[in-house]
């Protein structure tokens, strides 16, 4: 259900590398949420750094949405970068697992392609 990759990079360096890897793999970053910053703005003390990237590949999203608009509730894909146990972690929910919730077996290959690319993006960001 969850894919997690550790990296020796800081959250900031991993975020920069993720931006580049997303672009290199023909996905786009739609939004970046700074969870710590948002919590503080809402009056909640939150010491842990966490960035949540919303990423999308429009052609793949269209294939899925043309088949089942309910899948829009699971879009766009998200990749989080945070610290855990002294390491920086890149994490995402598996698109194949999410799409399985919508009973659309005909879209399994699309979900697998997206998942493979997201894992590739995460590996490039973690190591590159």
Named regions from a protein language model:
Residues 78-104:
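Beta-strand/loop substructures that line and gate deep hydrophobic ligand-binding cavities in soluble
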Residues 34-81:
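Compact, glycine-rich, soluble single-domain proteins
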Residues 1-29, 123:
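Terminal, regulation- and interaction-focused segments at domain boundaries
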Residues 73-85, 122-128:
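Short secondary-structure transition/capping segments
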Residues 101-128:
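Well-ordered alpha/beta subsegment
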């Amino acid at each position: 259900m969850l894919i997690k990759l550790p990296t020796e990079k800081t959250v900031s360096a991993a975020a920069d590398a993720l931006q580049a890897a997303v672009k290199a793999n023909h996905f786009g970053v739609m939004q970046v949420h700074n969870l710590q910053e948002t919590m503080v703005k809402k009056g909640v003390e939150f010491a842990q750094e966490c960035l949540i990237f919303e990423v999308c590949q429009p052609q793949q999203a269209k294939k899925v949405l043309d088949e089942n608009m309910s899948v829009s509730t699971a879009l766009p894909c998200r990749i989080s970068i945070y610290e855990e146990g002294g390491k920086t972690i890149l994490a995402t929910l598996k698109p194949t697992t999410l799409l399985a919730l919508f009973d659309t077996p005909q879209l399994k290959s699309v979900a697998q392609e997206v998942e493979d690319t997201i894992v590739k993006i995460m590996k490039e960001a973690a190591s590159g």
